[in-house]
Amino acid sequence: WGRATQKQMPDRVTRLYLHVFDWPKDGKLVVDGLLSEATSAFLLGDPSRSPLATGRERDMLAVTLPATVPDAVDTVVVVDIKGKPDVAIAPTISAPAPIFIDTLEVTVSSSQEDVELRYTTNATNPHADSPLVSGPIRLTASAQVSARAFRAGRPVSPISRVSFTKVTPRKPVLVDKTEPGLRYEYFEGTFEKTTDFRTPVKRGVVRVFDVSPRERNSRFGFRYFGFLKVPKRGVYEFALTSDDGSRLLVDSEVLVDNDGLHSPREKTGLVALAPGLHLFQVDFFERDGGFDLKVHWSGPDLPRQPITDRDVVIAVGNVRYRNR
Protein backbone atom coordinates (compact mmCIF):
# COMPACT_ATOMS: atom_id res chain seq x y z
CA TRP A 1 0.00 0.00 0.00
CA GLY A 2 2.93 2.40 0.46
CA ARG A 3 5.72 3.07 2.92
CA ALA A 4 6.21 4.14 6.54
CA THR A 5 8.41 6.58 8.44
CA GLN A 6 8.60 7.14 12.18
CA LYS A 7 9.33 9.79 14.78
CA GLN A 8 9.99 9.56 18.50
CA MET A 9 7.46 11.51 20.59
CA PRO A 10 7.37 12.35 24.32
CA ASP A 11 6.40 9.70 26.89
CA ARG A 12 8.04 6.86 24.88
CA VAL A 13 5.50 7.15 22.10
CA THR A 14 6.54 6.26 18.55
CA ARG A 15 4.60 8.06 15.83
CA LEU A 16 4.29 6.20 12.54
CA TYR A 17 3.53 8.05 9.31
CA LEU A 18 1.94 5.62 6.87
CA HIS A 19 2.14 7.03 3.34
CA VAL A 20 -0.73 5.32 1.49
CA PHE A 21 -0.24 5.29 -2.28
CA ASP A 22 -2.76 2.52 -3.03
CA TRP A 23 -6.00 3.01 -1.10
CA PRO A 24 -7.30 -0.35 0.21
CA LYS A 25 -10.55 -1.29 -1.51
CA ASP A 26 -11.97 -2.85 1.66
CA GLY A 27 -11.15 0.23 3.74
CA LYS A 28 -8.72 -1.70 5.97
CA LEU A 29 -5.08 -0.63 6.05
CA VAL A 30 -3.18 -3.67 7.32
CA VAL A 31 0.40 -3.01 8.40
CA ASP A 32 2.04 -6.38 7.74
CA GLY A 33 4.64 -7.34 10.28
CA LEU A 34 3.62 -4.78 12.92
CA LEU A 35 2.52 -6.44 16.15
CA SER A 36 2.27 -3.26 18.26
CA GLU A 37 -1.07 -2.03 19.58
CA ALA A 38 -2.08 1.45 18.44
CA THR A 39 -2.97 4.08 21.04
CA SER A 40 -4.42 6.45 18.44
CA ALA A 41 -4.74 6.95 14.69
CA PHE A 42 -5.84 9.84 12.47
CA LEU A 43 -5.33 11.38 9.03
CA LEU A 44 -2.47 13.87 8.89
CA GLY A 45 -4.51 16.12 6.61
CA ASP A 46 -7.53 16.17 8.96
CA PRO A 47 -7.51 19.43 10.98
CA SER A 48 -9.89 17.95 13.55
CA ARG A 49 -7.79 14.77 13.93
CA SER A 50 -10.89 12.60 14.01
CA PRO A 51 -9.85 9.23 15.44
CA LEU A 52 -9.67 6.22 13.16
CA ALA A 53 -10.62 2.80 14.48
CA THR A 54 -7.76 0.33 14.93
CA GLY A 55 -7.72 -3.40 15.52
CA ARG A 56 -6.08 -6.65 14.41
CA GLU A 57 -6.25 -8.32 11.01
CA ARG A 58 -4.39 -11.61 10.53
CA ASP A 59 -2.74 -10.74 13.84
CA MET A 60 -1.31 -7.51 12.37
CA LEU A 61 -2.22 -3.90 13.08
CA ALA A 62 -5.19 -2.72 10.99
CA VAL A 63 -6.58 0.80 10.61
CA THR A 64 -10.13 1.45 9.35
CA LEU A 65 -9.98 4.21 6.73
CA PRO A 66 -12.65 6.62 5.46
CA ALA A 67 -14.59 5.54 2.39
CA THR A 68 -13.43 8.65 0.49
CA VAL A 69 -9.79 8.98 -0.49
CA PRO A 70 -8.54 12.37 0.80
CA ASP A 71 -5.56 12.48 -1.58
CA ALA A 72 -5.33 10.11 -4.53
CA VAL A 73 -1.55 10.53 -4.72
CA ASP A 74 -0.39 10.27 -1.10
CA THR A 75 -2.58 10.14 1.99
CA VAL A 76 -0.69 10.01 5.29
CA VAL A 77 -2.18 8.03 8.15
CA VAL A 78 -0.69 8.81 11.56
CA VAL A 79 -0.54 5.96 14.08
CA ASP A 80 0.83 6.30 17.61
CA ILE A 81 2.15 3.25 19.47
CA LYS A 82 3.72 2.79 22.88
CA GLY A 83 7.45 2.17 22.89
CA LYS A 84 9.47 0.83 19.98
CA PRO A 85 7.64 -0.79 17.07
CA ASP A 86 7.16 -4.50 17.70
CA VAL A 87 7.97 -5.93 14.29
CA ALA A 88 7.56 -9.56 13.23
CA ILE A 89 11.00 -10.66 12.03
CA ALA A 90 11.77 -14.06 10.53
CA PRO A 91 14.45 -15.87 12.58
CA THR A 92 17.97 -16.17 11.19
CA ILE A 93 19.19 -19.72 10.51
CA SER A 94 22.93 -20.05 9.99
CA ALA A 95 25.71 -22.64 9.80
CA PRO A 96 29.29 -22.74 8.52
CA ALA A 97 28.05 -24.18 5.19
CA PRO A 98 24.90 -25.70 3.67
CA ILE A 99 26.73 -29.03 3.22
CA PHE A 100 28.53 -31.17 5.78
CA ILE A 101 30.29 -34.52 6.11
CA ASP A 102 29.72 -35.85 9.64
CA THR A 103 27.79 -33.42 11.84
CA LEU A 104 26.76 -29.79 11.61
CA GLU A 105 25.81 -27.23 14.24
CA VAL A 106 23.03 -24.89 13.13
CA THR A 107 22.24 -21.70 15.04
CA VAL A 108 18.84 -20.01 15.14
CA SER A 109 18.56 -16.42 16.37
CA SER A 110 16.26 -13.41 16.23
CA SER A 111 16.48 -9.70 16.96
CA GLN A 112 12.81 -9.73 17.95
CA GLU A 113 12.34 -9.06 21.67
CA ASP A 114 10.46 -11.15 24.23
CA VAL A 115 10.01 -14.22 22.02
CA GLU A 116 10.88 -17.89 22.16
CA LEU A 117 12.13 -19.66 19.05
CA ARG A 118 10.84 -23.09 18.09
CA TYR A 119 12.04 -25.29 15.26
CA THR A 120 11.57 -28.47 13.24
CA THR A 121 14.00 -30.48 11.12
CA ASN A 122 11.52 -32.45 9.00
CA ALA A 123 10.20 -29.72 6.66
CA THR A 124 7.04 -29.18 8.75
CA ASN A 125 5.87 -25.84 10.15
CA PRO A 126 6.98 -25.09 13.72
CA HIS A 127 4.13 -24.82 16.23
CA ALA A 128 3.82 -23.97 19.92
CA ASP A 129 4.79 -27.52 20.95
CA SER A 130 7.79 -27.83 18.62
CA PRO A 131 11.27 -28.10 20.20
CA LEU A 132 12.51 -24.90 21.81
CA VAL A 133 15.78 -23.41 20.55
CA SER A 134 18.11 -23.48 23.55
CA GLY A 135 21.45 -23.65 21.74
CA PRO A 136 22.96 -24.93 18.51
CA ILE A 137 20.94 -27.60 16.68
CA ARG A 138 23.14 -30.60 15.90
CA LEU A 139 22.45 -32.33 12.59
CA THR A 140 23.70 -35.81 11.75
CA ALA A 141 21.67 -36.24 8.54
CA SER A 142 20.33 -34.05 5.74
CA ALA A 143 17.49 -31.86 7.00
CA GLN A 144 15.42 -28.78 6.38
CA VAL A 145 15.52 -26.58 9.47
CA SER A 146 12.42 -24.43 9.94
CA ALA A 147 12.12 -21.83 12.71
CA ARG A 148 9.52 -19.38 13.99
CA ALA A 149 9.16 -16.94 16.88
CA PHE A 150 6.38 -17.41 19.44
CA ARG A 151 5.02 -15.28 22.25
CA ALA A 152 2.70 -16.80 24.85
CA GLY A 153 2.16 -19.75 22.53
CA ARG A 154 1.18 -17.54 19.60
CA PRO A 155 3.28 -17.29 16.39
CA VAL A 156 4.65 -13.77 15.96
CA SER A 157 6.98 -14.08 12.97
CA PRO A 158 7.21 -15.53 9.49
CA ILE A 159 8.78 -18.99 9.16
CA SER A 160 12.41 -19.27 8.09
CA ARG A 161 13.59 -22.39 6.25
CA VAL A 162 17.09 -23.51 5.29
CA SER A 163 18.12 -26.92 3.91
CA PHE A 164 21.37 -28.63 4.87
CA THR A 165 22.77 -31.65 3.02
CA LYS A 166 25.05 -34.40 4.31
CA VAL A 167 27.57 -35.38 1.63
CA THR A 168 30.41 -37.85 1.04
CA PRO A 169 33.85 -36.33 0.38
CA ARG A 170 35.24 -36.83 -3.09
CA LYS A 171 38.12 -39.29 -3.11
CA PRO A 172 41.55 -38.25 -4.38
CA VAL A 173 43.49 -39.65 -7.31
CA LEU A 174 46.80 -41.47 -7.08
CA VAL A 175 49.74 -40.06 -9.04
CA ASP A 176 53.07 -41.88 -9.34
CA LYS A 177 55.19 -38.74 -9.55
CA THR A 178 54.49 -34.99 -9.47
CA GLU A 179 56.24 -31.69 -10.05
CA PRO A 180 55.23 -28.19 -8.89
CA GLY A 181 53.11 -26.01 -11.15
CA LEU A 182 50.17 -26.14 -13.53
CA ARG A 183 49.99 -26.99 -17.20
CA TYR A 184 48.42 -24.38 -19.44
CA GLU A 185 46.87 -24.09 -22.87
CA TYR A 186 46.83 -20.65 -24.45
CA PHE A 187 44.06 -19.61 -26.87
CA GLU A 188 43.39 -16.60 -29.06
CA GLY A 189 40.00 -15.47 -30.34
CA THR A 190 36.95 -13.31 -29.75
CA PHE A 191 35.44 -15.36 -26.94
CA GLU A 192 32.14 -14.83 -25.15
CA LYS A 193 32.58 -17.78 -22.78
CA THR A 194 35.30 -20.25 -21.90
CA THR A 195 33.53 -23.08 -23.71
CA ASP A 196 34.37 -21.22 -26.95
CA PHE A 197 38.00 -22.37 -26.61
CA ARG A 198 39.06 -24.59 -29.53
CA THR A 199 42.67 -25.27 -30.67
CA PRO A 200 45.45 -23.98 -28.37
CA VAL A 201 48.03 -21.63 -29.85
CA LYS A 202 50.64 -23.03 -27.47
CA ARG A 203 51.07 -25.14 -24.35
CA GLY A 204 53.42 -25.09 -21.40
CA VAL A 205 53.87 -25.14 -17.62
CA VAL A 206 53.56 -22.19 -15.21
CA ARG A 207 53.98 -21.92 -11.44
CA VAL A 208 50.33 -20.97 -10.93
CA PHE A 209 47.78 -18.68 -12.69
CA ASP A 210 50.30 -16.77 -14.79
CA VAL A 211 49.11 -14.85 -17.87
CA SER A 212 52.59 -13.75 -18.98
CA PRO A 213 52.79 -16.41 -21.75
CA ARG A 214 50.09 -14.46 -23.64
CA GLU A 215 51.02 -12.87 -26.95
CA ARG A 216 48.43 -10.07 -26.83
CA ASN A 217 46.58 -8.05 -24.16
CA SER A 218 43.05 -8.75 -25.33
CA ARG A 219 41.03 -11.51 -27.01
CA PHE A 220 42.95 -14.34 -25.38
CA GLY A 221 42.24 -17.22 -23.02
CA PHE A 222 44.01 -19.70 -20.75
CA ARG A 223 43.22 -23.16 -19.48
CA TYR A 224 45.22 -24.12 -16.38
CA PHE A 225 45.09 -27.72 -15.19
CA GLY A 226 46.84 -30.06 -12.80
CA PHE A 227 46.20 -31.31 -9.28
CA LEU A 228 45.26 -29.53 -6.06
CA LYS A 229 46.87 -30.73 -2.82
CA VAL A 230 44.04 -31.00 -0.29
CA PRO A 231 45.50 -31.15 3.24
CA LYS A 232 42.52 -32.33 5.30
CA ARG A 233 39.15 -34.01 4.98
CA GLY A 234 36.41 -31.39 4.99
CA VAL A 235 34.25 -28.88 3.17
CA TYR A 236 36.19 -26.37 1.06
CA GLU A 237 35.03 -23.09 -0.46
CA PHE A 238 36.56 -21.81 -3.69
CA ALA A 239 36.27 -18.15 -4.74
CA LEU A 240 36.89 -17.17 -8.36
CA THR A 241 37.28 -13.50 -9.34
CA SER A 242 37.71 -12.60 -12.99
CA ASP A 243 37.35 -10.04 -15.75
CA ASP A 244 36.12 -11.39 -18.18
CA GLY A 245 34.80 -14.94 -17.81
CA SER A 246 36.13 -17.94 -15.92
CA ARG A 247 35.24 -21.40 -14.62
CA LEU A 248 36.74 -23.55 -11.88
CA LEU A 249 36.53 -27.35 -12.01
CA VAL A 250 37.35 -29.84 -9.26
CA ASP A 251 37.51 -33.53 -10.16
CA SER A 252 36.28 -32.67 -13.68
CA GLU A 253 33.05 -31.05 -12.43
CA VAL A 254 32.29 -27.32 -12.69
CA LEU A 255 32.25 -25.97 -9.15
CA VAL A 256 32.33 -22.21 -9.85
CA ASP A 257 30.82 -20.76 -13.03
CA ASN A 258 31.86 -17.13 -13.46
CA ASP A 259 31.70 -17.26 -17.26
CA GLY A 260 30.62 -14.64 -19.78
CA LEU A 261 31.51 -11.01 -20.48
CA HIS A 262 31.66 -8.90 -17.31
CA SER A 263 33.74 -6.56 -15.19
CA PRO A 264 35.59 -7.96 -12.15
CA ARG A 265 33.24 -10.06 -10.00
CA GLU A 266 33.54 -12.95 -7.59
CA LYS A 267 31.60 -16.20 -7.45
CA THR A 268 32.02 -19.07 -5.00
CA GLY A 269 31.37 -22.79 -4.71
CA LEU A 270 31.51 -25.48 -2.01
CA VAL A 271 32.69 -29.09 -2.19
CA ALA A 272 33.57 -31.84 0.29
CA LEU A 273 37.00 -33.35 -0.35
CA ALA A 274 39.11 -36.15 1.10
CA PRO A 275 42.81 -35.38 1.62
CA GLY A 276 45.14 -35.96 -1.29
CA LEU A 277 45.41 -34.86 -4.91
CA HIS A 278 42.32 -33.75 -6.81
CA LEU A 279 41.99 -32.88 -10.48
CA PHE A 280 41.94 -29.10 -10.74
CA GLN A 281 41.25 -26.78 -13.66
CA VAL A 282 40.65 -23.05 -14.16
CA ASP A 283 39.56 -21.60 -17.53
CA PHE A 284 39.78 -17.84 -18.10
CA PHE A 285 39.43 -15.43 -21.00
CA GLU A 286 39.81 -11.71 -21.63
CA ARG A 287 37.84 -9.94 -24.36
CA ASP A 288 38.76 -6.24 -24.28
CA GLY A 289 39.93 -3.64 -21.75
CA GLY A 290 41.44 -4.58 -18.42
CA PHE A 291 41.59 -8.13 -17.12
CA ASP A 292 41.77 -9.84 -13.74
CA LEU A 293 42.02 -13.39 -12.37
CA LYS A 294 42.18 -14.37 -8.68
CA VAL A 295 41.58 -17.80 -7.15
CA HIS A 296 41.11 -18.26 -3.39
CA TRP A 297 40.14 -21.17 -1.17
CA SER A 298 39.35 -21.91 2.47
CA GLY A 299 38.60 -25.01 4.50
CA PRO A 300 39.38 -26.88 7.74
CA ASP A 301 42.15 -24.95 9.55
CA LEU A 302 42.65 -23.05 6.30
CA PRO A 303 41.57 -19.40 6.39
CA ARG A 304 40.72 -17.82 3.06
CA GLN A 305 43.87 -17.36 1.00
CA PRO A 306 45.06 -17.38 -2.62
CA ILE A 307 45.88 -20.71 -4.24
CA THR A 308 49.64 -20.56 -4.83
CA ASP A 309 52.35 -22.73 -6.35
CA ARG A 310 52.60 -24.54 -2.99
CA ASP A 311 49.07 -25.91 -3.50
CA VAL A 312 49.23 -27.28 -7.06
CA VAL A 313 51.24 -29.91 -8.95
CA ILE A 314 51.33 -31.59 -12.33
CA ALA A 315 51.59 -35.32 -12.99
CA VAL A 316 54.81 -36.73 -14.37
CA GLY A 317 53.96 -40.41 -14.03
CA ASN A 318 50.77 -42.44 -14.28
CA VAL A 319 47.49 -41.26 -12.78
CA ARG A 320 45.20 -43.83 -11.16
CA TYR A 321 41.64 -42.88 -10.28
CA ARG A 322 39.76 -43.99 -7.20
CA ASN A 323 36.04 -44.59 -7.30
CA ARG A 324 34.08 -41.82 -5.61
PLM segments and residue spans:
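Short beta-strand elements bearing conserved aromatic residues within extracellular beta-rich modules
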Residues: 41, 117-119, 246-248, 293
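Short beta-strand-plus-loop segments that form exposed binding edges in beta-rich domains
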Residues: 281-290
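Short, compositionally stereotyped local motifs that mark structural "simplifiers"
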Residues: 83-182, 191, 195, 199-223, ...
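Short tyrosine-centred short linear motifs in exposed loops/low-complexity segments
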Residues: 27, 140-143, 232-238, 274-277
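Short proline/glycine-enriched turn/loop motifs at strand-loop junctions of beta-rich domains
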Residues: 24, 34-38, 110-116, 241-245
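Aromatic-lined ligand-binding clefts that engage carbohydrates, nucleic acids, or primary amines
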Residues: 108-110, 228-230, 234-248, 280
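Short, surface-exposed beta-strand/strand-loop-strand elements in extracellular ectodomains
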Residues: 239-257, 294-297
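Mature catalytic domains of secreted/periplasmic carbohydrate-active enzymes
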Residues: 1-93
